């Protein structure tokens, strides 16, 4: 990948189980050979590996992917890197109005934590906090800056 030639890291979000179903072989080749950090929700990852449940998908991820953050809605998330496995609790939202953008905001918070040099569990907590913030409003763009939230959550990590 061009980014690797430039010394950069490639993160990918699977984004939609329908797309994964349609382009499974291409996604698997990309995920298993090029992607450094994989983000996926439960539906997307079970679709990618054509398995019936999250635990089976998790085993496939552990065999084929070095670094992944897998979201499970109110069940939280699981972060894997090599032999490390972190189960992250979901941050309860003030209310659930619209889940559009939850995965994107999880990834944004997680990557922010990674760039801050935080441990993986703390990165997962940042992602969960950002996801909780976005689902408590309508639309996928935060209504207010998230930096204060990130700093507050990171300070507790």
Q: PLM features: what roles do these ranges have?
A:
Residues 41-50:
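A short, active-site helix/loop in glycosyltransferases that binds the activated sugar's phosphate group
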Residues 31-33:
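A conserved, positively charged/aromatic
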Residues 17-23, 48:
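Active-site glycine- and acidic-residue-rich loops that bind
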